[in-house]
Amino acid sequence: MKKADILVLDFGSQYTQLIARRLREQGVYAEILPFNVSLADIKAKEPKGIILSGGPASVYATDAYFCDKGIFDLGLPVLGICYGMQLMAHHYKATVAPAGHKEYGKANIEVKKDSALFKNLPKKQTVWMSHSDKVENLSQGFEVLATSENSPFCVFGNEDKKFFALQFHPEVQHSEFGKNILKNFAKYACNCESVWNMGSFAKTQAEKIREEVGNDKVLCAVSGGVDSSVVAALLASAIKEQVIVVFVDNGLLRSGEKEQVEFMFKNTLGIDLISIDASEIFLSRLANVRDPEQKRKIIGNTFIEIFEEEAKKHKDVKYLAQGTLYTDIIESSVVGASKTIKSHHNVGGLPEKINLKLIEPLKEIFKDEVRALGLELGLSKEVVYRHPFPGPGLAIRIMGEVNRPSLELLRKADVILLEELKSTGWYDKTWQAFCVLLNVKSVGVMGDNRTYDNAVCIRVVDASDGMTATFSHLPYEVLENISRRIINEVEGINRVVYDISSKPPATIEWE
């Protein structure tokens, strides 16, 4: 079992993943586990500290979430955040009750006592609150470390046990010294060293791949995106002669994607590529299918069928490698009290029984870590910083049924969007940009004639790891040019709208 410096127990907060991200950014390997993980599994990870995340429940409610009480007897430092704070207070018989004044948003705190958490940090800080319950008193052995206007027990702790509790969320960017607080907990309370980096990760993963695969061969599924490209490069660095790289054209690719992928692997990466045209199979199976989850399942099942058929053509192929990320695992499964958001085609979209063993060497890291790993492996910045493209492709960017006419409309609009973003310098400033065909028609006027054509939505977002995102504040003139070109150049589209939703509550992709 892989060891972790810090274990984050998930009680359902939308920010849980950010806790792990902030620690990893500082070289400390953090891993997320469900709140009800067994004490034996925790011990097996040999952590140096534990963090209890926030969550939507109340510790005094009948449906409250509780971790194993033995966590507090392991002799490890523990940090409780929001719900985790209240859980710690509740465990030690302090009073937790509904807050008369709920706090959502920015608040100011003042440090009242020196502690490991606030070492080398200012006494007054701006933090981000998101709670409707409060701690009303402290148990023996605990003392106040910081206060806010509405929270006299905003931060408390027991320095001897190295137990600390925060009412606010240090993991979000709005807490100006939040990252430093988490770093201090890891460094001064848990004695963690900053040794986690992509160089060490690449070396460790290569060793694991060689050990697991032995003399067998691996079928590596690639899409041309950064995730699968990095997987292919990592496998090539570990077992180059045993890797068979396969690209499947599922008919759901962007304009020119197939040609770009074939060129990139052959000329940029120096990796032989088997290219399979399976567009007819995918599109026929997607005919008349409107439900997004069903689309994902069909695509996942079909991919596996094709890969298994290809594997039969090669001797000793026992494994299938995929570019599954930590975010895919989180969004496709129930982690602690968190709910499934959507099934990813390479996680929840897989059939229950497949004839190949899965290798997912990136499943422990986030997207920005994948990019850093790609550079570590020698991939070009052009490859590493391509915008993410979902495995199900354009199928989840078409609302409702997927067919060739709809795909053609979407491809043409998407080409224009990307051309305009690249020509104005906005492509490299944003995380992801694409068009969504809404399959909704509206009335328009072109010349003196009435039109009744499709509407397309532009989605451009800023993010660092894809777990959260905000819409990009593109200049009006850029948006205007994109809209004008799409309406004038793509017959069948007469309306363009811009998606100004953030994640959460929306996801980046529409389906």
Swiss-Prot record:
Keyword Ligase part of the UniProt annotation: yes
Entry's EC annotation: 6.3.5.2
Residues in GMPS ATP-PPase domain copies: 196-386
The organism's place on the tree of life at top rank: Bacteria
Gene: guaA
Stored HAMAP family: GMP_synthase
Pathway: Purine metabolism; GMP biosynthesis; GMP from XMP (L-Gln route): step 1/1
Domain Glutamine amidotransferase type-1: 5-195
One of the record's GO cellular component terms: cytosol
Source organism of this protein record: Campylobacter jejuni subsp. doylei (strain ATCC BAA-1458 / RM4099 / 269.97)
Taxonomic path: Bacteria, Pseudomonadati, Campylobacterota, Epsilonproteobacteria, Campylobacterales
Name listed for the protein in its UniProt record: GMP synthase [glutamine-hydrolyzing]
